């Protein structure tokens, strides 16, 4: 059995009410308090709008959920309630439903996001360090509360660059971590899926989020979005193997007694490890430092138990400047 290196027993030690989302009784608010202003996005499970709270004229985000199992909606709500107030976690303000259709909507705090395809190419070396550090705060917090996000990707990281404010959003795939539990591997978005999902290892843990973060980080520093560009789940593992090599992949599979299905094994083939230096070019060299590469290398590991935890990641030398700036703000001279 594989078990998380950190925060493994959070839900074992908490009362059942904390993680038993199926028992949740939803307190419905008043739908008429909110009006839709404009559509800002859509996902597989929802449509998202900028809205306004008509009582105080404050902007908000309205996430109208598509017909999905009640259980899944309860899970998302319970997780958002448990995490509310945590660093850089999007705040759930209200839950309402349509009187007639019974369609539920989640009301969130407003974030003036710039699309990552526009924002990321403009970010400086320091900006990337700053925002990844802010994202790590959210991940360490949710992990410390016994929750895996399971869908970390640029689309789910809202950044208001003017205010230098980051929020981790879309907790629809998030789940409570219970040691030894076997989870669905059909989570996360293809380019950000950890090897554990691609080889069908079900007793994964928080470290899945650290792989996704690594993919996101690689895309940012190498200006290659997405970094691992697979055309389907099998091809996704092939793309990873062409960078990390097949020797380390086989060591991983052997350690956890995993057999690849023969078709996938044939597709993966044999590849040597590609050094990170091969991804450096004139366009991205100003973002790639030895510390950045060392940090990336400690995230993008096949073996989920070898990856940095969010807390360990925050202590990495790559964030030295960010930590120094934070400390001087906390203790003004």
UniProtKB/Swiss-Prot annotation:
Main location class: cytoplasm
InterPro entries assigned to the protein according to its UniProt record, in alphabetical order: CK2_alpha (IPR045216), Kinase-like_dom_sf (IPR011009), Prot_kinase_dom (IPR000719), Protein_kinase_ATP_BS (IPR017441), Ser/Thr_kinase_AS (IPR008271)
Subcellular location: Cytoplasm
A Pfam family per the record: Pkinase
Gene3D superfamilies, per database record: Phosphorylase Kinase, domain 1 (3.30.200.20), Transferase(Phosphotransferase) domain 1 (1.10.510.10)
Keyword Kinase: yes
Entry EC no(s): 2.7.11.1
Record domain Protein kinase: where: 34-319
GO biological process annotation, one example: regulation of cell cycle
Protein name (Swiss-Prot/TrEMBL): Casein kinase II subunit alpha-2
Gene name in the database record: HD6
């Amino acid at each position: 059995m594989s078990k998380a290196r950190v925060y493994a027993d959070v839900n074992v030690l908490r009362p059942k009410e904390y993680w038993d989302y199926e028992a949740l009784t939803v307190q419905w608010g008043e739908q008429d308090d909110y009006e839709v202003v404009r559509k800002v996005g859509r996902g597989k499970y929802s449509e998202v709008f900028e809205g306004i709270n008509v009582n105080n004229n404050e902007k908000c985000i309205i996430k109208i959920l598509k017909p999905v199992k009640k259980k899944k909606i309860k899970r998302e709500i319970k997780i958002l309630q448990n995490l509310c107030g945590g660093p850089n976690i999007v705040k759930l303000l209200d839950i309402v439903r349509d009187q007639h259709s019974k369609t539920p909507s989640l009301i969130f705090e407003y974030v003036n996001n710039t699309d990552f395809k526009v924002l990321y190419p403009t970010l400086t070396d320091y900006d990337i360090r700053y925002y990844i550090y802010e994202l790590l705060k959210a991940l360490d917090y949710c992990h410390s509360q016994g929750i895996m996000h399971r869908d970390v990707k640029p689309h789910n990281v809202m950044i208001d660059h003017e205010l230098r404010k980051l929020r981790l959003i879309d907790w629809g795939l998030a789940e409570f971590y219970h040691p030894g539990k076997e989870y669905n591997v059909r989570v996360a978005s293809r380019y950000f899926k950890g090897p554990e999902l691609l080889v069908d290892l079900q007793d994964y843990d928080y470290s899945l989020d650290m792989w996704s973060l690594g993919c996101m980080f690689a895309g940012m520093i190498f200006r290659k979005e997405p970094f691992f560009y697979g055309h389907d789940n099998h091809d996704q593992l092939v793309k990873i193997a062409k960078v990390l090599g097949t020797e380390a992949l086989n060591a991983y599979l052997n350690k956890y007694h995993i057999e690849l299905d023969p078709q996938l094994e044939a597709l993966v083939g044999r590849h040597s490890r590609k050094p990170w230096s091969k991804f450096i070019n004139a366009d991205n060299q100003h973002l790639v430092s030895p510390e950045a590469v060392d940090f990336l290398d400690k995230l993008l590991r096949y073996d989920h138990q070898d990856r940095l935890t969010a807390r360990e990641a925050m202590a990495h030398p790559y964030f030295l400047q960010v930590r120094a700036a934070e400390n001087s703000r906390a203790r003004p001279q």
